[in-house]
Amino acid sequence: MPPAIQCLDSSRYFPKVKANDHINLTIEPHQIFGLLGPNGCGKTTLLHQLQGLDAPTSGAVKVLGLDPRRDRQELMARIGTQLQEAQVIPRLKVIEVLTTFGSFYPQSQDPMMVLESVGLAAKAGAFVDKLSGGQRQRVFIALALIHNPELLFFDELTSALDPQSRLKIWDILRDLKAAGRTVILTTHSMEEAQTLCDRIAIMDAGHIIAEGTPDELIDEFAQGSTLKFSVSGTVQPAPLEKISGVTSVDIQGQDVTVIGKGDFTPHVMQVLTDQHVSPAHMSLNPATLEDVFLHLTGRSLQA
């Protein structure tokens, strides 16, 4: 089985912008793959090439072993993409929208079965413009699934949704992966990427600057977990700095911050005991993908 996606030294240049610059990326099938990066980093340009809407200036891209431009008609029957809200007629019923879109394909699934899979069977007779934001997003997922594609592209699928709606969509994406599909997910939510994605590529300024599993990226690029506490006495920093795995110690008056990798907290506690200092208001925050992105780019993803 070929990779779901291959970018082979692909670049896309515009007169004054290198939107994609020498992209090399292989995405294996049957996983949720996250594509992260700030606005303007080149994600949309890359997605357009993968969907056959544009072609690289140099290099090549392959999707399911096909050339997205040359083989676009064949590819469209095998991939599903998320529509934007303006592309759906609001005064149609949900079942009518799915039936209409299903008619565009030589083979499509039963609309009610698809609605059942996204938890919207009870809304089949509802008008699209009467649905909640989370329900409309599930309609868009159903439309992407109507022809039973192997590969799915979703762009900011849960942005602006309430937590309950977001969790429902996360469950749907997990079900799609369990059913053997490949999902390409672009998101600004580091929590979403860390929770859902098997592998992640981080883009910035037209380049892929890191790629791996969430744990691999955190282990390689994040400074580590952050331990914060306050003290009533004086803490000598040198013994804390010598603890294996500790990468940073910052003491501001009574507030102490220790950053490190591995299980360094018990050793910090021992140092405090040896110095006859009792910590208070202690909190431990594990390293996250947000820390990785900040380390790699010097800014948060929301910036």
List each model region and its residues.
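Short, charged/small-residue-rich alpha-helical element at the C-terminal edge
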Residues: 223-299, 303
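ABC transporter nucleotide-binding domains
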Residues: 5-7, 12-205, 210
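ABC transporter nucleotide-binding domain
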Residues: 171-259
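Hydrophobic aliphatic residues
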Residues: 79, 173, 221, 296-297
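A broad structural signal for alpha-helix termini and local helix breaks/kinks
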Residues: 14, 102-105, 221, 244, ...
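ABC-family P-loop ATPase nucleotide-binding domain
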Residues: 1-11, 299-303
